[in-house]
Amino acid sequence: MVKKLYDLLIAYVEHKLESVRYEIIGAEKRRAEKRTTDPLDGTERMVAEDSVRLEVEIPRGNGMFSRVRIKVKLLIEEFPISDTDLEEEIFTCIFRNLKITYIASTNDHTVYFKADGCRIYRNDDIDIFKEI
């Protein structure tokens, strides 16, 4: 199997970003219609998928990734922290199974991420505030 430079770059970025403790900037609730196929009869139908898109920033001290902001999609219905709390306090998180899902070919080369969940911390505490 031939290694592809693109696959190596993706794996490198995912590896470097998987254990970073991000500062949570904001959360946006989203609903999208997804096409799904019934495994029993093969019919296609549209299903609503709720998600939350977290905007986070990589803190200083992480080399070339320092101060980079990314948006990460979480397949949850509701984010447990309100916008008001995010403005008043600092919350950080570590994502579980962070993956790059798509890189746009447009001029801005937007990179899309998703994660299976995250651990949320209040301020710089070592105790977990919430796990989703």
Regions found by a protein language model. Give the residues of each.
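OB-fold and OB-like single-stranded nucleic-acid-recognition modules
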Residues: 1-132
